[in-house]
């Protein structure tokens, strides 16, 4: 197919694999080719190349049968059929990114990853989602030591072959301009960038001062539920070394036992 060199799905497209494996060297298609205007499906899923759609309705059936919502449908009939979101709406389900994996052609692609890299340029690493207690299995794909894409790793006993948009697209926050990349110390009402040695030494002096003046009960450690098991273990070791017994991770003012 002529679109393959410019299609974002090139190299991992089922239609491309079948065409190369079983297709002829020349096309017998003589009819006028369809040209479909791209649809707006939201900030995560790109439907700019809907002329490639083969109307398999995988995306429609996924949103209805797996996600449990009706946000995508087949409009019109015959050669005028189009896959589109409901009029005046976009795809908002928290599982919307899975339609990208389900699409067997390059009709539905990832907006954040669009034209970022080819599949054969990416290195793959297996990992587990840290965003909730489910522990969805993931494949993190990197290029030039930078995370470029996150895909589901099939595990029938946990997440099957689906992942939430939170797991799929949260990697963008790793390199966001608003994320702190160096420690900061506040002095005279202003924040200043410092190196890690200076920051850790400042923390040590502050803790020593508080413990010396107000006892250990004046110190508490607040861990994040997003931390890994290894990070929480080190947090506990730090608390034991300081003799601190006040440790918590609850961010909401509610009884965690409920």
Describe each region flagged by the PLM:
Residues 1, 14-51, 61, 66-100, ...:
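Ferredoxin-type iron-sulfur electron-transfer modules in oxidoreductases and energy-metabolism complexes
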Residues 3-11, 30-32, 160:
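Intrinsic disorder at enzyme termini
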Residues 8, 49-50, 55-56, 60-61, ...:
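Catalytic alpha/large subunits of respiratory electron-transfer oxidoreductases
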Residues 12, 80, 227-229:
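Surface-exposed, flexible loop/turn segments at secondary-structure boundaries
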Residues 12-16, 172-173:
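Extracellular/mature segments of secreted proteins
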């Amino acid at each position: 197919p002529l679109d393959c060199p410019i299609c974002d799905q090139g190299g991992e497209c089922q239609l491309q694999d079948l065409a190369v494996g079983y297709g002829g060297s020349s096309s017998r298609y003589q009819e006028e080719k369809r040209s479909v205007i791209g649809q707006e499906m939201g900030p995560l899923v790109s439907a700019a190349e809907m002329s490639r759609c083969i109307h398999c309705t995988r995306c429609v059936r996924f949103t209805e049968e797996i996600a449990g919502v009706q946000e995508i449908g087949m409009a019109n009939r015959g050669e005028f059929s189009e896959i589109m979101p409901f009029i005046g709406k976009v795809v908002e389900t928290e599982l919307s990114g899975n339609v990208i994996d389900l699409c067997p052609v390059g009709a539905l692609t990832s907006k954040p990853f669009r034209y970022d890299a080819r599949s054969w340029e990416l290195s793959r690493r297996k990992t587990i989602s840290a965003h909730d207690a489910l522990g969805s299995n993931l494949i993190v794909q990197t290029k030039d030591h930078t995370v470029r894409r996150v895909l589901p790793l099939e595990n029938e006993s946990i997440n099957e072959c689906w992942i939430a948009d939170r797991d799929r697209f949260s990697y963008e926050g790793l390199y966001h301009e608003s994320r702190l990349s160096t420690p900061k110390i506040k002095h005279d009402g202003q924040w200043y960038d410092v190196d890690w040695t200076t920051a850790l030494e400042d923390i040590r002096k502050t803790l020593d001062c508080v413990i010396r003046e107000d006892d250990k009960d004046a110190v508490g450690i607040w861990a994040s539920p997003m931390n890994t098991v290894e990070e929480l273990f080190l947090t506990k070791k730090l608390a034991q070394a300081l003799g601190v017994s006040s440790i918590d991770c609850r961010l909401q003012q509610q009884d965690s036992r409920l």
